[in-house]
Amino acid sequence: MNQDKPYYQIVYAPNDIFKKQAEYIDIVDDNIRTIVDKMLQNLHIERAVGLGANMVGILKRIAVVDLHENNKSSPIVFINPNITYFSEEKQTFIEGSLSFPGIEASITRSKAIKVKYLDYNGNKQELAAEGFLATVIQHEIEYLNGKTFLDSLSKLKRDTLLKKMLKHIKLHPPHIHGSGCRH
């Protein structure tokens, strides 16, 4: 991982980092903010809506989310996020991941949640989210808890998707979009 670049290289599955719990952060300092800034750059470059720190090889409880609603960037930084409420009402979305390129799966999650976290400056926050935002937050925090969106699927479905992903990676090697990118 090149520390001089303004972004990180995405870690691709299969990788043991996705089975590990991310570590809590004691103090939000400039080092943590640098990690966040680079993660936000990844989000922008990859045109993604969410990213957990372990997806860039960092085992810290950090997630960034930006739904880009109305073509406007409104990033939310979650440091040490903890979901304190899950609604009983569920919703299903087709989910994918930068770390699992070329595959998607229908995943059912709580329609509404409440999450406590520290923001970019280390201030305590609480957010009530519903709909797609709630799904994205649950998806990213799941990564920090050592799980992925595929873990809720049957072994057969998961294995089929992983084979499809490996074939996709072979045909379309993942890369960071940039000035040398031709698409």
Curated annotation (Swiss-Prot):
Family annotation (CDD domains): Pep_deformylase (cd00487)
A GO BP entry: translation
Cross-referenced SUPFAM superfamilies: Peptide deformylase
Residues of the active site: E140
GO molecular function: peptide deformylase activity
InterPro entries xrefs: Peptide_deformylase, Peptide_deformylase_sf
Pfam family, any one: Pep_deformylase
Family in the record: Belongs to the polypeptide deformylase family.
HAMAP family: Pep_deformylase
Protein name: Peptide deformylase-like
